[in-house]
C-alpha cells in the first residue's frame, strides 16, 4: 500500500508541476481550481462520459453561472459540492471547517437488504470477537463471520484463530453487508486465506498526464496465499449496496478464489484509489486518482454483481429471519 501511494503521488506530481496556474481565493478562483483538479487528475472522466453521459466542460459552464463574488462560504460550498456530485463517486469529498461534502447515492435509494437487529440475533450473545471479526458456529454447523468495517484492523493471527475455531464447519458465511471500506491491506489479508496459490485478481492503471485518457498500461494485481491456515471448504460472501471501496475490492478478490461465491445485491462500487488536493481557500478535495479493474479488465467503479442474486424478504423479516443468511445456509448444506 505504501508503494502504491508513492506511485500515485509521483504521477500526480509529474502531471501538475508544469505550467501550474495559480487561482485567486475568490468564489470564482476556488471553483476554477476545483474544476481543473478534477479535469486533470480525476481518473473516471472518460468512463463516466460513456456510462452516465458526463460532460465535464458542460458542468464547468453550468456551475460557473451559479457563482457571484459576494456569496458566503456555505453558499460556495453548496455549489462546489453539487458540482462534484455530478461525478457520482463516493470517493469524492469536499472538506471544509464546517462540513464534509459527500455523495452517498451509491447506496441511498436502493434496498439495504440488511436488518441490523436480525443480523445481531444470528450472532447471539456468545459470539467471539477477534479484532474486527465477529464470529460463531450456527446450529447447522455453518461458520458465520461478520466484518463491519475494514477500518477495524485484523492480523494474520486473528484470522488463523477464527478459521481454526470454525475448521469443523461444513461451510462458511462471511457477511460484509454495510461494510463501507477501510484499509485495503486488511481486505487482502482476509482474502489471502481463501486461495492456495498466487492468483490474478485484477488490474490497476495510473494517470501519466493531464489528459482524460492519459493512463499507464494496466498493471496486474495478484493475491498471494496466506502462509498460515487457509480455508478449503465452500464459502459464501454476503453483499449489498453498502459494500464500498476496500470492501468492493475484497469482493472482487474473493470471486477469484476457488469455492467462493457471493450472494445478495450488487456492491456499491468505489473502484478508484483516492487522493487529496487543496483549494486556494484551504478546503480539501478528495477524488479518485487511479482506477481498479477486475481480472477481465472491466471497471468495478459502479459495483460488482453477485454470483447469486438474493433480496431480504419482508415476510422473513417479520419472522425474525434474514433471507440472505438462510439462503446461504441452505446452499452450503447442499454442498
Across the structure, where does each feature detected by a protein language model lie?
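Flexible, low-complexity junctional segments that flank or bridge functional domains
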Residues: 4, 17-206, 213-219, 234, ...
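C-terminal "post-core" interaction segments
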Residues: 18-39, 74, 141-142, 171, ...
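Sec-dependent N-terminal signal peptides
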Residues: 6-9
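Alpha-helix termination/capping residues and helix-transition junctions
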Residues: 11, 166-168, 229
Amino acid at each position: 500500500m505504501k508503494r502504491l501511494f508513492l506511485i500515485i503521488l509521483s504521477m500526480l506530481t509529474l502531471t501538475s508541476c508544469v505550467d501550474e496556474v495559480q487561482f485567486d481565493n475568490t468564489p470564482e478562483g476556488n471553483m476554477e481550481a476545483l474544476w481543473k483538479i478534477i479535469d486533470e487528475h480525476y481518473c473516471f472522466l472518460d468512463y463516466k462520459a460513456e456510462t452516465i453521459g458526463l460532460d465535464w466542460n458542460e458542468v464547468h459552464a453550468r456551475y460557473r453561472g451559479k457563482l457571484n463574488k459576494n456569496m458566503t462560504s456555505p453558499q460556495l460550498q453548496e455549489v462546489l459540492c453539487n458540482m462534484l456530485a455530478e461525478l457520482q463517486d463516493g470517493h469524492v469529498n469536499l472538506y471544509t471547517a464546517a462540513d464534509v461534502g459527500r455523495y452517498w447515492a451509491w447506496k441511498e435509494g436502493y434496498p439495504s437488504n440488511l436488518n441490523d437487529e436480525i443480523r445481531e440475533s444470528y450472532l447471539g450473545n456468545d459470539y467471539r470477537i477477534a479484532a474486527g471479526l465477529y464470529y460463531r458456529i450456527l446450529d447447522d454447523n455453518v461458520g458465520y463471520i461478520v466484518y463491519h468495517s475494514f477500518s477495524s484492523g485484523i492480523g494474520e493471527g486473528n484470522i488463523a484463530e477464527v478459521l481454526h475455531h470454525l475448521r469443523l464447519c461444513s461451510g462458511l458465511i462471511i457477511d460484509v453487508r454495510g461494510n463501507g471500506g477501510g484499509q485495503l491491506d486488511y481486505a487482502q489479508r482476509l482474502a489471502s486465506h481463501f486461495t492456495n496459490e498466487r492468483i490474478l485478481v485484477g488490474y490497476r492503471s495510473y494517470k501519466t498526464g493531464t489528459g482524460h485518457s492519459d493512463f499507464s498500461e494496466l498493471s496486474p494485481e495478484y493475491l498471494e496465499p496466506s502462509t498460515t491456515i487457509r480455508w478449503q471448504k465452500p464459502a459464501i460472501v454476503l453483499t449489498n449496496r453498502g459494500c464500498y471501496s476496500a470492501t468492493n475490492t475484497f469482493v472482487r478478490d474473493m470471486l477469484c478464489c476457488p469455492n467462493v461465491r457471493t450472494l445478495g445485491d450488487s456492491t456499491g462500487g468505489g473502484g478508484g484509489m483516492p487522493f487529496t488536493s487543496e483549494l486556494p481557500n484551504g478546503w480539501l478535495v478528495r477524488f479518485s486518482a487511479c482506477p481498479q479493474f477486475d481480472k477481465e479488465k472491466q471497471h468495478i467503479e459502479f459495483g460488482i454483481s453477485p454470483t447469486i442474486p438474493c433480496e431480504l424478504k419482508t415476510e422473513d423479516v417479520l419472522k425474525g429471519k434474514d433471507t440472505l443468511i438462510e439462503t446461504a445456509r441452505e446452499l452450503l448444506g447442499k454442498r
